[in-house]
Amino acid sequence: MQTLSLDGKIAAITGGASGIGLETARRLIAAGAIVHLLDRDRDALDSAVADLGPGAIADVVDLFDYAALQQTIDAIVARHGRIDILHANAGSYVGGKVWEGDAGRWDAMLNLNVNATFQTIRAVLPAMMRQGSGDVIVTSSIAGAIPIVAEPVYTASKHAVQAFVHTVRRQVAPHGVRVAAVLPGPVHTPLLKDWDPQRLKDEIAAGALMEPADVAEGILFMVTRRPGVIIRDLVILPHAFDV
C-alpha cells in the first residue's frame, strides 16, 4: 500500500505564508519534506516559519522580479542539490461586473495569477528535468474549468492557467516531471475579501465554503503518487456549492 511519505523531499511554495500555501506546507512537512516558503511579506513569513517549525525555511522574494525569483530557485537547488516539489500557489482574486471593473486591480491580478505563475514554473523546470523527476502543482480554481459569471476576469485568468498547465505537462512528461492543477471551489481565505460581506456570511452558514486544509490534503495526495501516475486535475468543492 502506498504511503504519504515525503522523507528527504525538497519543496517550494509561493504564497506560502498564509491560506492554502501555509496549510500545504504544514502537511508536506508532517510527511517529511523540507519546505521553502516564498513570499514578499517578511513578517508573515517569520510568523509562518515559527508556526511550522524547523522543516520550514523562509525566502523573501517578489514574484514580479523574475531575476530574483530565478536566483531564489537556484539557491534552493544549490543548497539541497535538488528540488522535488513546486506548489505555484500565489494568486489574487477580483470579482464583480466587468463594466464596474478597475483596470489597475485587473492588471495586478492577471500579473500574479498568470505571469508570475508561468515564470515560477519556468524557473524550476530545468532543475527538475536534469534530475529526471519533480512535481509542479498549480493552485487553479473551479473557475478554470467552469466559467463563473460573478468573476469573469478571474475566470479568464484561471482558464489561462489551465491551458498552460496541460501544454507544459505534455512537454515535460518525457523528462519524468509531472505538472498538474488543483481546482478548488470557494475557500475561506483572505482572497475572499472582495466578496459581499452578507454573501460570505451566508455561504459559511450554508457550508458552501471549504477551509485551506481541505485543499492541502488533496495536494499531499497528488504529490505522493508513485512515478508513472499523475492526478492531472483535482477538483475539490464544498458539498453545498452548486456550480
Please state what every model-predicted region is.
Residues I121, S157:
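Active-site helix of classical SDR
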Residues P126, R170-Q171:
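Alpha-helical segment proximal to the catalytic Tyr-Lys
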Residues I10, A17-S18:
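Conserved glycine-rich cofactor-binding loop
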